[in-house]
Amino acid sequence: MAALIARSGLKALNIRQTRQQRMATVPRAAVEFYGPDRAKFLGPFSENDTPEYLTGEFPGDYGWDTAGLSADPQTFARYREIELIHARWALLGALGILTPELLSQYAGVQFGEPVWFKAGAQIFADGGLNYLGNESLIHAQSIIATLAVQVVLMGLAEAYRANGGSEGFLDDLDTLYPGGPFDPLGLADDPDTFAELKVKEIKNGRLAMFSCLGFFVQAIVTGKGPVQNLTDHLADPTVNKAFASATKFTPGV
């Protein structure tokens, strides 16, 4: 009898250990960022509840959709694609806006014009706009021609992507997260790491989209780049602040 009890106890212990081992192997990202137990942000008018169609299957789903924009699965899929593409463009744009101004102010790197909107405005100057400051690369003098080329080249690339590319070209890759040759560093090889990186990408992409909007507004209101605006604010926060700039702003002046 004692031996039977000992064997039963050992079996129960093994079952508990096996269950704990299985729980330990559940990816952290799967619990923290996905599924019903994920972190949620229930914003205004959410009635403290998550819509049933937001199951936590996709990265960046925090359970808030007051307007019901994601209720239709096809619309949801389209919005996911649009958001991710714009997020990636915003990440690149924010980097391109900040880097030249930072390098110019704090590293002494010489640019023809480090402020992002002033650099683009050089196309209206008599000398035109030289890409990367080098006239031998692209010397643009017509805004209409530049826009036309941009629309044609980017339109063709976007149409090619939206239509799934050519037949047989990278058919086995995901359209939003292709990986493979597009991940030469192998950052997405580990499933748990990949799941977490997708969440980080969309979170930072959303921040970048808001940042770019802020950069545009700053450029219109203050006529300065974001780095200079931050420098001015830190030097005198009571004078150089958003409220003061907004109250002094006159469109067209």
Curated annotation (Swiss-Prot):
Any one GO molecular function term: metal ion binding
UniProt binding sites for chlorophyll b 4: Q150, R161
Cofactor note: Binds at least 14 chlorophylls (8 Chl-a and 6 Chl-b) and carotenoids such as lutein and neoxanthin.
Post-translational modification as stated in the protein's UniProt record: Photoregulated by reversible phosphorylation of its threonine residues.
Annotated chlorophyll a 4 binding sites: N204
PANTHER family, A to Z: CHLOROPHYLL A/B BINDING PROTEIN
Name of the protein in question: Chlorophyll a-b binding protein of LHCII type I, chloroplastic
Source organism per UniProt: Dunaliella tertiolecta
